Amino acid sequence: MTQFSNLPIFERARILVVGDTMLDRNWSGLAQRISPEAPVPVVNIEQQTATAGGAANVAMNIAALGGQVYLCGLIGDDDAGAVLRQIMREHAIGDALSVCALPTITKLRVLSQHQQLIRLDFESNRYAECAHLMAVPFNRALPEHDLVIFSDYGKGSLHNVSALIAQAKAAGKWVLVDPKGTDFQRYRGADIVTPNVAELTAVVGHFADEKTMIAKARACLIDAGISAFLITQSEKGMTYVTAQQHYHLPAQAREVFDVTGAGDTVIATLACALASGYDCESAMIFANAAASVVVGKLGTATLTPTELHHALAPRAAKARGLVDLSQLQEQLHYLKKQGKTVVMTNGCFDILHAGHVRYLEEAKALGDCLIVAINTDESVKRLKGADRPANTLASRAAVLAALHSVDWVISFAEDTPADLIAAINPDILVKGGDNRVDDIPGAQWVREHGGSVRVLSYVDGFSTTKTLQQFLSHHEKD
C-alpha cells in the first residue's frame, strides 16, 4: 500500500466522464419576514452563484485534483447550457456537451443563512431520446483516456450505458460507475460501482448489520457481473467488496456541513488514483479522505491536492510512527485555521500500560487532536538511568501511534520539551500526576500565548517502574 507522506500526484490521470450533466444555481439572502400573500418566508436575494453539477461536478473534481479530464453529456440550447459550457472552459476541462432540444438540467436552491429553503428543478423526462447524441464524441474520446466514469443520475443520458461499458472494457479501460436506480444489471462489466447505503438497499433489500450488507452486496455484484462495489456509508466510512474479499475503512472524523456532491468527489478521487497507478486500497483511502474535506463545504464543491494531502497527514503520521516538526507545524497551521483545538502532552512512555491509555484518551477528549512528545533514548537514559528505556524510540512511537486517541508522535532530545512546546504552541498542554502547573515545562509559554494547562490524574495501580520490577522478578524466578 502507498505511503501518504507526499503530495498525491494525479497529473498522469486521463479520465473520460460520461453522464447526466447539470447546472447548480444557488440564490442566497436574508429571510426576515413572512409574505402577506401566503405563509412563506420572503428572501431578499443578495447573491447568485452557478456551479457545475452531476457529471460536470465529477469532471470539476478531477480537474481540481490535477487530472486530465474530458466530459461527454447533454445540454440544452439555453442560458444554463451556455453557463455550464463556460464553467468547463474556465477550468480547462475538455468537453463534448451535445446540444439537444430539451432544457439543460438545472437545480435552483434558495438559501438563507446557509439553510436551504426550497429547491426548484428544471428538467425533462425525455433525455433518453437524446442519448444517441453522445455516441460520436464518446467514440472519439475513448482511445485517448485510461479510465471512464459513468455518472448516472437517472435522467436518461446513460440510457445506453450497458453498450458504452462494453465498448470501454473492449478497449481495455478501467470503468467506474456512480449508479442510480434498482437495475444494476445495466452496469455489467464495470470494475467498481459506488452505491451509497440507500442506493444499495434499494437493490438488495434491507440489511441489519455490516455482515449482512456485505453478503447481499457480494451476491448482487456476482449476479450483475460487476467486479467490485465501493459502498459509501456516510459517518460509518466506506466498504470495498469483491466476490472474494472485503475491506472497510472508517470515516475520518470531520464536521459535516453539506453532503451535496460528496459522491462525485469520492468517485473522482478514486478515479484519479487508479488512473495514476495507485492500488485499490490506496485509492479508497484517498477517496475517503477527500470526502471528509468536501462535506465541510457548502454545496457542490471540489478539493485541491494540498487539501487532500492535509487530510491524509494524520494517516501518514500513524504509518511512520514519528513525525518531524516542520511537517507537524504545516498540518497544525491548517487545522488552526479551521478553528481546531490542539492538545499536547509528553513523557517517556517506555512500557505502555492501561493507565497510559486512559490518560491519553482523557487528554484527547479535551480537544480535536492530540500530540504526544516523547523523550529520545538518550534523554530517557539521563532521566531514568542507564538501563532505560526498555523499548527503543521507534518502538515506543509505533505503539503510541497505533492508539486511536493519538494523532501525532514527535520526539525531543532535551531533558524537557519546553522548546518543542514553544515551537508547536498547543492550545492545551496536559500533564499527569501531582504536578504543579507552575512546575510543568512549557506551561508559562502556553499560558502567555493564550493557551491553558491541565493536570490529569493518573490511574491508580499502574507504573512503568512497577511493571518492569514485576517482569524482572518473574524472570528471575523462571
UniProtKB/Swiss-Prot annotation:
The keyword Nucleotide-binding applies. It is an enzyme of class 2 (transferase). Pathway: Nucleotide-sugar biosynthesis; ADP-L-glycero-beta-D-manno-heptose biosynthesis; ADP-L-glycero-beta-D-manno-heptose from D-glycero-beta-D-manno-heptose 7-phosphate: step 1/4; Nucleotide-sugar biosynthesis; ADP-L-glycero-beta-D-manno-heptose biosynthesis; ADP-L-glycero-beta-D-manno-heptose from D-glycero-beta-D-manno-heptose 7-phosphate: step 3/4. The keyword Transferase applies. It comes from the Bacteria. ATP binds at residues 196-199. SUPFAM superfamilies: Nucleotidylyl transferase (SSF52374), Ribokinase-like (SSF53613). GO terms for cellular component: cytosol. It catalyses: D-glycero-beta-D-manno-heptose 7-phosphate + ATP = D-glycero-beta-D-manno-heptose 1,7-bisphosphate + ADP + H(+); D-glycero-beta-D-manno-heptose 1-phosphate + ATP + H(+) = ADP-D-glycero-beta-D-manno-heptose + diphosphate. Residues 1-319 are annotated as: Ribokinase. One of its GO terms (biological process) is ADP-L-glycero-beta-D-manno-heptose biosynthetic process. Keywords: ATP-binding, Carbohydrate metabolism, Kinase, Multifunctional enzyme, Nucleotide-binding, Nucleotidyltransferase, Transferase. NCBIfam families: cyt_tran_rel, PRK11316.1, rfaE_dom_I, rfaE_dom_II. Catalyzes the ADP transfer from ATP to D-glycero-beta-D-manno-heptose 1-phosphate, yielding ADP-D-glycero-beta-D-manno-heptose. Homodimer. In the N-terminal section; belongs to the carbohydrate kinase PfkB family. This is Bifunctional protein HldE. It comes from Dichelobacter nodosus (strain VCS1703A).
